[in-house]
Amino acid sequence: FLVDLQDYVESHTASSYYFGHFLFEDKGSRNFAIIDGQQRLTTITIFISAIYRRLEELAGAFSEDDIFLYGTLVKVGQTYRFSTVDYDNQLFRDYVINKVKTDRNGLETESQKRIVAAYDYFVSQLNAYDEESLHDILEAVVNATCTTHTVKDEAEAIQMFIFQNNRGKKPSNLEIIKAQFLYNIHLYCTSEDEKAELISEVKNRFEHIYKSISKIEGNID
């Protein structure tokens, strides 16, 4: 990711950097669930946070433009522009965004370990950048383009997730199985209360499965 961006900046091309295609579900009130592209958006947010950490180290304070961009891209007040999956989100905010957690204790999942490792990697690599270089690469991120498709119905979103295949990481078999369960609940469950209860149960059970797999992978490593 960083190498690609650096190559783009050094190429001085007139075209914008391309982040790929994203699939969203419109949840209303200007909130969108990410159906496809979660991993890329997580990486982008981690990278921007690492840039701002380095900028603060160099300059001591942010310019008005930097403050505006940070509020637009990452966080303004107590409003977060991006959230990752529920079971990783608190760690994501504490370690990456707010920087109130500075150790690696209590990491429960492999995905949490990857979040911490990615942030630490970017912080380490960006130590070699001066303020001008940081702004150059931040500008490339801010002006990057992407294509998007947005759906309003969760059942359609789940169905599209199952069959979507683009530049992002291909869903695992477990993720597809979970999506199939959710899709069938939407398809065949007529009671809204029962539907909500079943969806919550499926998500909770799969969260437990993900954590169990993560612990097993950690023991193997």
Language model segments and positions:
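Covalent nucleotidyltransferase
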Residues: 1-221
